[in-house]
Structure formats: structure tokens, C-alpha cells
Amino acid sequence: MSTNGWFLLIGMLMLARGFAATTISRSPFTSAIVYLAVGILLGPSCLNLFRFDPTKESALLEMLAQAALLISLFSAGVKMPVPFNLARWNAPLRLAWVSMTLTVGLVALFAYYVLHLPAGAAILLGGILAPTDPVLATDVQVRHAGDKDELRFNLTCEAGMNDGSAFPFVLLGLGMLHMDDMSDVATHLAQWLSVDVLWSTAGALLIGGGCGAAVARIGWQLRVVKPRHEIMDDLVALGLIAIVFSVASLVKASGFLAVFFAAVALRQTELKLAGAPKDRHGLREPELAKSQVAQDSATNDVPQVVSAESLVFKEHLERLSELTLVLLLGGMISLRELPYETIGVAAFLFVVARPLAVYVGLMGSGTGKRMRGMIGWFGVRGIGSIFYLVFAMQAGLPPALAKQLTGISLGVIMLSILVHGFSVKPLIDDAK
């Protein structure tokens, strides 16, 4: 497809999505299903007007998926409730690390014993398919910074962290595939645990939390000086994302976790500096903070601004990323060439691995059975899985294995968008 054709197609989809926003919100399916259907219709499965080869275009696809993830992770982070409370974050922390690890292990066992993949490839497939997606899960995400829905909070917070917590398993699988001398496994595992797991997480927390809090304080100080300084919130947020991700990556910490923690720290620090009042649950009210800002500005007092413009801007970029990448997904898939193992892997992941991992991970957390069941079902796979797939390709997968993992992964992502996309609205409405 020509450049003009791409502009025309994406422009028409954007117009249609914009005009049909109310219709789609009332329909039983998500916007991602619409984009996927258009991609499949125009792609190699039907009209064959375009084909996007993830193997040949892995570098471009990696960049697009990475940008979409970073924007989505930042948007999720600034919606987290303030102040941070370990008891409230207990469930998502368990989901992001305990349930994530169990999901990787279960998928790896299935791939090893049923699909007969090598151990390294089995772990790699588990790392690719285990993380839930922050980009495509907008219908079950926290809708705004003051949203107190427990299900949405758990799912959003989990998705914000588990893209980073899955990365060590992708590295472990790749390391095992490229390991020539199996006698040195203990040394490699020790290095993996100390650097790729422990330091990656701790470094991300330190870098992201420190940078987010520092930017919030700098912005607040600039706003309280006279004459008052205007701040371009969108550029500040994008700059924070870029700096935090690059610094974390340079020191081998998790860039995805660092960006999420930076957004959380930014919002936490801003609301505390603004003196936002607390509700009966002890959470600060961002809307009340905005009202106070308006009153202060009207009386020329010191403005204690907590800006929402950057969040709005990121959500617009998030929608554009979703449209583009899901459309490309449709162009990557040929329904006639999907591996036969795809349905088995998807069924095992959706019905066995994810629910079981969530149930075990939340044992003793005080989370009710109904809530655990809902969380166990809502785990859409999407852009994060695409990123880790093409990351593995860039790391040098053997061609035959790359083709097999690509077919399985893209097929599972497609089925996840369809199955979870059709079930999310009825189940969310039923849970209210």
C-alpha cells in the first residue's frame, strides 16, 4: 500500500472512530475489534491490499510498539490513587509478580510438553504471552484519576507493572536459546536473578520514582514564583518519559517499570504539594484540588496547579497507537496460515493459566472470589506481547522458531482481542 493509501485508510478510521464514539461505547464490542476486522479484511486473509511482515519490519514494529507502551504506561501511572498505600496495592503487586511468574511457568510447561518446544523457547513464549496489555485494555482501565473502582484499579495497576516484570523471562528464554555451554547454567541464573530481576526492578523504582518526584517539585516551584511561569505540560511529560526510559535502559534497569513509577511519583507528589483534600477512604481528591486551584487563581494567590492536560494528550496518543498497531496486526495475520497450535495455546492461557495464576497469586490477600474470577478472566494480550515478540526477533531467533512463535503469538493476540473484547462490556455491566 502506498503512503497516500495509508494516510487515507488511517484518516478514514480516525474519522469513523471519532464520529461513532457514542455508538461504539453502547455496542457490545470494543474499538480494537473494529480495527482488527478492518485489518483482516484488507490484509492477506481477505482482499490482500496490504501485508505487514513482522519479520522483515521487526525494527519498525518494535519502535511503534515501544512508543505505544510507554505512553500507555505513563497514562496508567498518573491515574493511580493518591497517596500510595501498600495495603491497597497488595493485590496488583501480587498480580504483577506472583501471578505473572506463575503464568509464564504454566505457559512454558505447556509449550515444552505439548508443543515440544525447547526449554528456552518455551520460557520465551511464556514471557511473550504472560503480560496483560495497558494499551488495549481501556474498557477495564481506571477511567480518570479519581476513579475508585477496585476491579479497574487492580487491572490497570497490574498492566502498568507486568510489562516490566515479564521482561526478565524474555531475557531468560533468549539466554537459554543462545547458551552454548550448559555446564555454566548456575552462573547464568545467578546473574539473571541479580541483574535482570532484582536490580532491574529496584533500579526502575529508584530512577522512576526519583525523577517523577523531582519533576513535580520543579514544576510546582516554577508555578509559585512571581511572575508566574506557564508550563507546557505535554512536553514536560514526554520529556520525563524519554529521560526516565533512556536512563533506566542505560543502567540495565527496566525502562517500562521506570516510566510507570515516574508517572505514579509525579502524580503523588503533585497532589500532595497542591494540598488536595482527602476523602473518607484517605485518598486525595484531584477534582477538589482543581477547584482549589481555580479559586486561588481567581484571588491571585499562589496557584497550586495539578495539571490534567498531559494526561488528556497521552490518551489521544494512546488511541492513535491502538488504531495503528491493531490495524497492522490484521495485516500481519493470514487466517489460512495460522499454526494449528494457536487455539490450544489460547484456550490454555485464557481458561487455565491466567485464572489459576490469579487465584494462587491472590490467596490470602482478602480479595473476594468474584473479584478474583473477574481479574482472572480480564487479561487481554496485545501490544506488550507484540513488542516482546519483535524484541526476540531482533535478538536473533532462528528463522524456523521465529516463524512458529510469530504465528502462535499473533494468533493468541487476535483471539484475545476478540474473546475479551466481546465479553468485557457485559461482564463489567453485570459486576456493577
Which residues does each PLM region occupy?
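Transmembrane helical cores of multi-pass secondary ion antiporters/exchangers
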Residues: M1-K432
